[in-house]
Amino acid sequence: KTTLSEQHMDSRGLETLLRNFSEAGVLEVEGNTLRFTSEADRAFAKGGWLERYVFRAVDDVSGTLAIRDKAANLVVVDGAGVTNELDVAFMARNRLFVIECKTARMDKEGSTKANDTLFKLAEICRRVGGLGTRGLLASYRSLGNAEKRLARVLGIELVCGVDLARLDEKLKTWVKS
C-alpha cells in the first residue's frame, strides 16, 4: 500500500501510467492510495518494467547483432568477492555489454544521483568484464548536460527519456561501434 502526495495526484503522466498498470492488473488505485496485487507486481511497477523492456529489445536484435548470450538480473561476484547485479548483460563481438536501467528521478533529494549511477556502472564494467566491456545507462528520465558530459568521459552510452522508444536502433549502433 502506497499513498500519493497532492503533487503526484496532479501529474497527468503519472495518472496515465497508473491507469495502464491498473488495467494490466498490477495495482489498484483508490483515491490517493495504491494497492499492489503482489510484491512481484510492486517490483515490476517500481522499475522492473524497464528492465523487461530493455531485455526484450536486446532479444529482438540478437540475431542481427550476433548476440551469443544474454541475461537479465544477472548476479556476478568479481575476483575480489564483490557482488553486483547487472540489470541486462550480453555478449557480442567478443565483448561484454552491460546495461543499467533506471526509472527513478535522479535529481530528487535523497535519491541516487545520476553521477553516482554513471560512476558505479563504469566501475562495474571495469571490474566484471575488463577494459573491453561496454556500459549503457537506460533511463526513463532525461539527464542534464553535466551528466551527459560525464557519461561521455566515462565511455558510458546513454539511452534516456524519449530515446527509449528507439532503443533497438540505439542498441544496433552501440554494439556495432
Predicted segments, located by residue:
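Intrinsically disordered, low-complexity Ser/Thr/Pro/Gly-rich regulatory segments
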Residues: K1-S177
